[in-house]
Amino acid sequence: MNKNIILCGVGGQGTVLASRLISAAAMKEGLPVQSAETIGMAQRGGSVFSHIRIGEGVNTPMIGLGQADLLLGFELGETVRQLPYLKKDGRVIAAERAVMPVTASLGGGYDPSVMKQYLQEHAAALTIVKVEKAFETLGSAKVLNLLLLGAASASGALGLQRSSLLAAIEDNVPPKFLDLNKKAFCYFE
């Protein structure tokens, strides 16, 4: 299996942890994996994105334009910003959520419905994940990363076994947050 995955969002959404969980799950399955993260001003609400490349013959962790199989978007505006990296037949799974990154707020912001419409018009395969009800059910919005990871896994878009992802969660999430994160991961089963 060869898979190129980009995760994108804003600081504080758990994008980096989700990237590390995907990489750990791939390694548990014996697959070669390389990843790179750009976190910039993440702690201040800036843009965050991760590139993950799984499979043989990968020489660099960076994914070229038009080469991503999957774009996992934690925030609509950032998802649109990373869309040029998606293959023509690639898949987008994005949270139906807009969080104004600091960089966007400096320029006056954007309309989330316009971002959603743009994705609908330009992505060959698009799944918009409605996360607000899940936040209410689970009692926390801090599990966005595991909700999206679970939705991507349930759809088969990651190409990894759910058991490998669950094992990666158990190995990488602190014990006091483990139960909530596993519930979030399994929410869309």
Which residue ranges define each predicted feature?
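Active-site cofactor/cluster-binding pocket
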Residues: 1-189
